[in-house]
Amino acid sequence: MPSHLDQTLAAALSERRAQYRYRQRKLLQSPQTPELVVDGKTYLAFCSNDYLGLANHPQVIAAQQQAAARWGAGSGASHLVAGHTQEHHALEEELAAFTGRQRALLFSTGYMANLGVISTLVGQGDGVFEDRLNHASLLDGGLLSGARFQRFLHSDINNLQARLRKTDAARKLVVVDGVFSMDGDCAPLPQLAQVCAQENAWLMVDDAHGFGVLGETGAGTCEHFGLDQQQVPVLMGTLGKALGSFGAFVAGSETLIETLINFARPYIYTTAMPPPVAAATRASLRLVQSEAWRRTHVQQLIAQFRNGAQDLGLQLMDSFSPVQPLLVGSEAKALAIAEALAHRGILIIAIRPPTVPVGSSRLRITLSAAHTEAQVAQLLDVLGEVMNSTAIRGLADD
């Protein structure tokens, strides 16, 4: 007989299934490339965050292998005990220089970085103001910080400013995604920076999906908009997306980084990333700076895809980033489209609530420098076939 624990949990799982929101993992049997082997079948994939195609780059792999031979497989300790190696330190210095900040600090994951920064900067008696479409890690960080937590309307400067003017919080932290992970649009960072300056608030940008891809050199959304450390004092970026590696960093002033080293619990109380991962990321960062053609190629593919989607009458969301969501509506329809694409050899994941708001389920299509124009053309052909099929057209949008 199932235990009380299992019975209780099974009821929640059954509800998820009934709502078409049940999630299952796919078993990959190949490296991250446009062609993935999943559960024994080969697909042309448009669902990876490997935006520059660096996860399987020979130089990145070689750097990790060589570092493993020198440093071993793991760091063995936290950064503050005995786990902070020369590889970690060099990567932090290189990230700081690349982003135009005084210092940078490595975190094991983006989720940990966001929780660590927000809980360090604000607490009881303070206020944290977040865009309604922020990543879950940012929202969780705000909720767990103990500060008064407010969500302003998506990219609505007036709504944010009104909230800032009403608060009596001692500290005010405004938090946004640089590129919103499920919508692909950019936050209006220049206007946000201006409002924060006017209202004596601090601006934090999570640039997980802009770092490496946007900006003249790939330094991200802050570079894209021409914003410096004074305008965006807290910058977070991840290393497992465009850089094809793993981990995250926070960049800012000397004082900010020293504060995080001393007060950010997710930094203090966890093992440092393996040194070979830091070495691989350093190789990726060099490629980001030396191979600008990758960003150019991605932008060309984005234009090709958006033009083709417009010709097909597909409802894409407003995005010039590699994240190109196709808005569908209902969970059932999104799943049906993803399944139909999979039957035709295209792997795209249906994104459903609670990740996105109810009624806005979508296919989160992502493009990479590793894709070819022919592969994007193939995607468009199959999308047109599926979206115009009788089976899909007959499904309700909500």
From Swiss-Prot:
InterPro entries: Aminotrans_II_pyridoxalP_BS, Aminotransferase_I/II_large, AON_synthase_class-II, AONS_Archaea/Proteobacteria, AONS_Proteobacteria, PyrdxlP-dep_Trfase, PyrdxlP-dep_Trfase_major, PyrdxlP-dep_Trfase_small. The keyword Transferase applies. Pyridoxal 5'-phosphate binds at G110, Y111, S181, H209, T238. The modification N6-(pyridoxal phosphate)lysine is found at K241. The keyword Amino-acid biosynthesis does not apply. Disulfide bonds: none annotated. GO terms for molecular function: 8-amino-7-oxononanoate synthase activity; pyridoxal phosphate binding. PROSITE patterns: AA_TRANSFER_CLASS_2. GO terms for biological process: biotin biosynthetic process. Keywords: Biotin biosynthesis, Pyridoxal phosphate, Transferase. Substrate binds at R23, H135, T355. Its EC number is 2.3.1.47. CDD domains: KBL_like (cd06454). Pathway: Cofactor biosynthesis; biotin biosynthesis. Its cofactor is pyridoxal 5'-phosphate. It catalyses: 6-carboxyhexanoyl-[ACP] + L-alanine + H(+) = (8S)-8-amino-7-oxononanoate + holo-[ACP] + CO2. Catalyzes the decarboxylative condensation of pimeloyl-[acyl-carrier protein] and L-alanine to produce 8-amino-7-oxononanoate (AON), [acyl-carrier protein], and carbon dioxide. Homodimer. Belongs to the class-II pyridoxal-phosphate-dependent aminotransferase family. BioF subfamily. This is 8-amino-7-oxononanoate synthase. It comes from Cellvibrio japonicus (strain Ueda107) (Pseudomonas fluorescens subsp. cellulosa).
